[in-house]
Amino acid sequence: MTKLYDYYKNNIIQNLMHKFNYRSIMQVPKIKKITINMGVGKSVTNKKLLEKATEDLMVISGQKPVITTARKSISSFKIRQGQPIGCKVTLRGSRMWEFLERFIFIAMPRIRDFRGLSIKSFDGHGNYSIGIREQIIFPEIDYDTVDDMRGMDITITTSAISDNEAYALLTAFRFPFRK
């Protein structure tokens, strides 16, 4: 696995057990999966944009993305039901740990005007969502081949019961939250 996973196994589990007074190691929250979603609204008129977004997401995650389709028709957006409008990847296991390590220590410091992550992005069940405006923060993306700046949503799903537990878990992973 990765250094981050070893750090979780050796340090974070013990720290969280003492902090929240867990009786078993199985009660300690862990990261279950990371979902990366890239919505391409302009793909309605230009199919090449969706192909490029899929390619970018594949390079970032190391896994082939699934094309997402519209659930229902919306005439004001010129979208029909079943029309492809984005792509997503769900990472688990070793790919998840590798992506998380690259995201925390390489990609996040490259975000322009970064002032820390918002604490308000927890969903109430211990999951955290981050919105990224540019895909070029990842070193795998070649800046010269980028045709359009595309954002993405990154959702970190944890086994934590409350937001406080998830916050403690992500802080232990050195997520830079705003004070």
UniProtKB/Swiss-Prot annotation:
Keyword tRNA-binding part of the UniProt annotation: yes
Keywords tagged on the record: Ribonucleoprotein, Ribosomal protein, RNA-binding, rRNA-binding, tRNA-binding
Chain segments annotated as coiled-coil in the UniProt record: none
GO annotation, biological process: translation
InterPro entries on file: Ribosomal_uL5, Ribosomal_uL5_bac-type, Ribosomal_uL5_C, Ribosomal_uL5_CS, Ribosomal_uL5_dom_sf, Ribosomal_uL5_N
Listed Pfam families: Ribosomal_L5, Ribosomal_L5_C
Transmembrane segments: none
GO molecular function, one term: structural constituent of ribosome
Gene3D superfamilies: 3.30.1440.10
GO cellular component: ribonucleoprotein complex; ribosome
Summary of subunit composition and partner proteins: Part of the 50S ribosomal subunit; part of the 5S rRNA/L5/L18/L25 subcomplex. Contacts the 5S rRNA and the P site tRNA. Forms a bridge to the 30S subunit in the 70S ribosome.
Homology family: Belongs to the universal ribosomal protein uL5 family.
Function as written in the Swiss-Prot or TrEMBL entry: This is one of the proteins that bind and probably mediate the attachment of the 5S RNA into the large ribosomal subunit, where it forms part of the central protuberance. In the 70S ribosome it contacts protein S13 of the 30S subunit (bridge B1b), connecting the 2 subunits; this bridge is implicated in subunit movement. Contacts the P site tRNA; the 5S rRNA and some of its associated proteins might help stabilize positioning of ribosome-bound tRNAs.
Protein name, as recorded: Large ribosomal subunit protein uL5
